[in-house]
C-alpha cells in the first residue's frame, strides 16, 4: 500500500498515455518500453497519419458529463467556433464544447474538427512538425490522447517510428475494478469512494446517481454510473475497453 498513486490532474492523466518515458510514473504498475530502432509501435500514426483515421463517435461524446456533474443535454447548436490563425484558421473548433464537459474529454480528442474536405494539422507550427501531413477523421473528432508534439512528424506519422511507452497495468484500472465489484455487491458507499478518486483527479464533482434517459440496459443507476466512469476513463484503451464490453 502506498507504493502507487494517481498522477496529478488532467494533464497527469494524459501523461500515462503519451509519455516517451514512463519510468518514475507513480501510477504505473507495469509498462512496456519502446525505443526506435529496437522496438517501436504505430499508435501515434493511427491517430494523426495522412490517411483517414478513426475518431470518437457522437454517442461516446455524449457519455461525458458536464463539468458540474450534470447529464449532457446534447444541445450543442450554435456553440461551434472557428480557429483564428495558422494553418487551421477559419476551420471549426469545439473548444467551448470541451470546456463544458468532463476535462478528460479535452485530453482525449482535438479541440477542432477534421473531416474529409476539412483536414487539419495537429501541432501545426511547432518545432519538428514542419513536414506534418494533413489528417482527416472518420467522425471529425480526432484522437489526441496518445499523441505528443516532441517526436518529429517524420516519426510520429510513420508505422515504424513511434516510441511512446505503453501502459499495461496502472492504478486507475485497479480503482475502476474495485468500484465495479462494490457496485455489483450493492455497496454504493465503497463504489463511490473509488469512483471519486478518479473524478477528483479529473477535476469533476463527486459521484451523483441520476436517472439517465440513456440508460437502456436495465441496470441500476449505480451500475450505470460506474460503467460511464469506466468508459470515460479508459476511452480508446483498446484491449481494456474490449474486455469491459464483453
What are these regions (language model features)?
Residues 48-74, 128-135:
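Short, cationic low-complexity segments
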Residues 1-48, 82-246:
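Acidic/polar-rich alpha-helix caps and helix-coil junctions
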Amino acid at each position: 500500500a502506498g507504493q502507487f498513486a494517481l498522477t496529478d490532474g488532467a494533464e497527469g492523466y494524459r501523461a500515462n498515455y503519451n509519455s516517451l518515458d514512463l519510468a518514475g510514473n507513480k501510477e504505473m504498475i507495469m509498462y512496456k518500453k519502446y525505443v526506435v530502432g529496437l522496438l517501436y509501435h504505430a499508435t501515434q500514426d493511427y491517430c494523426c497519419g495522412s490517411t483517414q483515421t478513426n475518431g470518437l463517435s457522437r454517442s461516446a461524446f455524449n457519455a461525458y458529463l458536464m463539468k458540474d456533474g450534470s447529464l449532457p443535454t446534447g444541445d450543442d447548436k450554435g456553440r461551434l467556433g472557428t480557429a483564428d490563425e495558422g494553418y487551421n484558421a477559419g476551420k471549426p473548433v469545439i473548444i467551448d464544447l470541451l470546456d463544458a464537459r468532463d476535462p478528460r474529454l479535452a485530453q482525449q480528442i482535438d479541440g477542432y474538427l477534421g473531416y474529409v474536405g476539412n483536414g487539419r494539422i495537429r501541432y501545426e507550427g511547432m518545432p519538428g512538425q514542419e513536414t506534418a501531413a494533413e489528417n482527416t477523421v472518420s467522425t471529425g473528432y480526432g484522437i489526441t490522447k496518445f499523441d505528443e508534439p516532441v517526436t518529429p512528424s517524420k516519426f510520429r506519422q510513420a508505422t515504424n517510428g513511434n516510441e511512446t511507452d505503453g501502459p499495461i497495468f496502472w492504478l486507475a484500472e485497479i480503482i475502476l475494478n474495485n468500484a465495479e465489484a462494490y457496485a455489483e455487491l450493492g455497496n454504493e458507499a465503497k463504489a463511490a469512494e473509488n469512483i471519486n478518486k478518479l473524478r477528483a483527479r479529473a477535476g469533476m464533482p463527486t459521484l451523483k446517481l441520476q436517472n439517465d434517459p440513456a440508460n437502456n440496459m436495465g441496470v441500476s443507476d449505480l451500475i450505470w454510473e460506474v460503467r460511464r466512469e469506466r468508459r470515460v476513463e479508459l476511452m480508446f484503451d483498446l484491449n481494456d475497453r474490449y474486455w469491459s464490453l464483453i
